[in-house]
Amino acid sequence: MKEQLIFDLSRSGRKGYSLSPLDIPERPADELLPSKFLRKEPAELPEMAESEVVRHFIRLSNLNYHVDKNMYPLGSCTMKYNPKINDYTCDLPGFASMHPLQPESTSQGALQLMYELAEMLKEIAGMKAVTLQPAAGAHGELTGILLIKKYHEKLGNKRHKLLVVDSAHGTNPASAALGGYECVSVKCDESGCTDMGDLRAKLDGEVAALMLTNPNTVGIFEKQIPEIEKLVHGNGSLLYMDGANMNALLGITRPGDMGFDVMHYNLHKTFSAPHGGGGPGSGPVGVSERLVEFLPVPVIEKFEKDGQTRYRLNSSKPNTIGRMMNFYGNFSVLVRAYTYIRMLGADGLRRVSENAIINANYLLQRLVEHYALPYPRPVMHEFCLSGDRQKKEHGVRTLDIAKRLLDYGYHAPTVYFPLIVSEALMIEPTETEAKETLNAFADAMIAIAEEAKSNPDLIKSAPTTTPVKRLDEAQASRQLNICCQH
């Protein structure tokens, strides 16, 4: 049943609250506030009983799709199950009731947690230092780019280009532009990896850095990393790794050991914090020795005083790029990531990546006969199929397949990305899904592939069982209207 807007449920004069009688003289609002702050018309607020409000939002919540309900196969998003102990530790009064302007003397526990989290992230990725400030992955990218810029400025290098491989994460070009660089695309070869000939042709004295996602967005590990590292550093450029896909590498290999100078982590993805609906996120940045002096301030330092270990915030860093946000990062996500890492330990983190890789390859093998595979080779934690076969033979697009999947009770995968794959379906099952769940999802995808042959119109009209049917997305994009009308 379609749920009405809360404004449509409103009834004039109905109340969900009661106030005590005034114990002071009542005065008109215009005697207390300047007229410029007063409304000319009463606010259009819904009038409902408390029970009606509760039931309305409960009904809406039952319509939501989330990882606690079922598998969430969004490629490149790592929608893993988030252990509930993360929320427990985050809600501890000593953390939840803190204010970032508290004195350091009363914030030692929080400072210790952030210091130790940075140390663990350093070890996991093989980097020299880590800042926890960036609020999300793309914010971490921008931080890394500004670090690269500061490095070249100090050396007197006037470099204005950033190379971005076309299999990289989608936010890389935008971050490069925001950082003041010209973005130059490097092609992929027929295997889905960086085209070394194209890289050599575009790597010149104007290139500040190469941005690479590894594994890339078709789920393939860049096998030429040693050669890429040698070429980039030999050109006086730096090597940036987008850590969006770190869920494939934990305990197996480390970006720092591969020669990367700077990378960002997505704590909300790899280290399990809820991130559907826009956040909050956390995108810490790790750097090699050559970039440590440029890290954002304040830096958390550990020291000894009166025989006790203490922690402090140090803003006296002359070559810093400055702050990247107010205060010290999204602390609630930092607590969740810290809990996750401490619960799993080094061996557990390696099993996370091993199971993510196993799940992705198992699911791929179940689907590969039914959908085109642009790069036919083993993958890491995710894979990218193509709906080209269904489109050419039956007129069914990837968008139709994604909409039909909603009728089977699943959130759709990432579609039409990466751009190097026609009619792309990017699927990331994560390590937290059981074989039975993978099989059920595969069965749904296979059933849709069969429906494309036998009843393509059914798929083109999907979804048919959801509260909201297919929207006119083209009209919505061209005639944007986000105002509530009632």
Swiss-Prot record:
Catalytic reactions on record: N(6)-[(R)-lipoyl]-L-lysyl-[glycine-cleavage complex H protein] + glycine + H(+) = N(6)-[(R)-S(8)-aminomethyldihydrolipoyl]-L-lysyl-[glycine-cleavage complex H protein] + CO2
Residue(s) carrying N6-(pyridoxal phosphate)lysine: K269
Entry keywords, A to Z: Oxidoreductase, Pyridoxal phosphate
EC number: 1.4.4.2
InterPro entries: Aminotrans_V_dom, GcvPB, GDC-P_C, GDC_P, PyrdxlP-dep_Trfase, PyrdxlP-dep_Trfase_major, PyrdxlP-dep_Trfase_small
UniProt entry tagged with the keyword Secreted: no
The protein's enzyme class: oxidoreductase
Listed GO MF terms: glycine binding; glycine dehydrogenase (decarboxylating) activity; pyridoxal phosphate binding
Keyword match Hydrolase: no
CDD domains tied to this protein: GDC-P
Cofactors demanded by this protein: pyridoxal 5'-phosphate
Subunit and interaction comment: The glycine cleavage system is composed of four proteins: P, T, L and H. In this organism, the P 'protein' is a heterodimer of two subunits.
Protein family membership: Belongs to the GcvP family. C-terminal subunit subfamily.
Annotated protein name in UniProt: Probable glycine dehydrogenase (decarboxylating) subunit 2
Organism encoding this protein: Chlorobaculum tepidum (strain ATCC 49652 / DSM 12025 / NBRC 103806 / TLS) (Chlorobium tepidum)
Taxonomic lineage: Bacteria, Pseudomonadati, Chlorobiota, Chlorobiia, Chlorobiales
